[in-house]
Amino acid sequence: MPRKHLIASGINKKQQQQAKIWMKCAKEIKAAAKMGGPNPEANSRLKVAIERALNNNLSRDSIERNINGASKDIDNLKELTYEGYGPNGLAIIVRALTDNEQRTISAIRGYFSKLQGQIAKPNSVSMLFNECGQLLINKETKSLDEWFEILIDQSIIDINEDDKIIEILVKPEDFSTVKLILEKNNADIKSAEIKLIPNDFISLDEYARERLVRFVNACENDDDISWVITNYEEEL
């Protein structure tokens, strides 16, 4: 039986990880509201940030506080995107929100160096991805065929399934409409966000995979980095 201090340590670590995710969601909401205004219907970036925050269980009160506090925020955050390659041609995109560009690029270069990768020219990697609305729903409510029939009049890019989850990919502009249809049909939505989806996936050997895990962990623990995405075939 695990000792109490080990259990407590595991719980505290999970709480810290969740707190960091919420902090990044709040930062993204505040930046989006400051750049494009507080109305999510007129600010698509804010709408996406809110969806991501809700998906990560950030409370609506916290979301509202960050939207309302955006105009009072004195931090001048800059959005930066870095593209690069890792082992075996692994494609990587890193998105950051920072008030110190030099600090952030120095950190990201260090992460790529430890990965034995390199930062690439802008748009040389992003062409390997497509921006899509991704909705993951529990299969227990309806089958793939039933959902396909419900969504047949929508502009669905693709529908896939595994043993437990159905994945629905849509164009970003159709994301809110499809999500609403799913909700009206009592879908058990596990995840709903607009994200970059790789056109193709690659595999890595165990040594390269371990380096990638360390790279992703370093990025996730960096307060300036909003997210990192790759075309590795597994979800880390």
Swiss-Prot record:
Tell me which UniProt keywords the record has, alphabetically: Cytoplasm, DNA-binding, Transcription, Transcription regulation
Biological process (GO), any one = regulation of DNA-templated transcription
Domain of life according to the entry: Bacteria
Where is this protein localized, as stated in its record?
Answer: Cytoplasm
Claim: Transcription regulation is one of the keywords in the record: yes
Q: Name one GO molecular function term.
A: DNA binding
Alphabetical list of InterPro entries matching this protein: Integrase-like_N, TACO1_YebC-like_2nd/3rd_dom, TACO1_YebC_N, Transcrip_reg_TACO1-like, Transcrip_reg_TACO1-like_dom3, YebC-like
Where is it chiefly localized?
cytoplasm
Pfam families in the record:
TACO1_YebC_N, Transcrip_reg
Gene Ontology cellular-component terms for this entry are: cytosol
Q: Which family does it belong to?
A: Belongs to the TACO1 family.
Stated name of the protein: Probable transcriptional regulatory protein UU295
Q: What is the lineage of its organism?
A: Bacteria, Bacillati, Mycoplasmatota, Mycoplasmoidales, Mycoplasmoidaceae
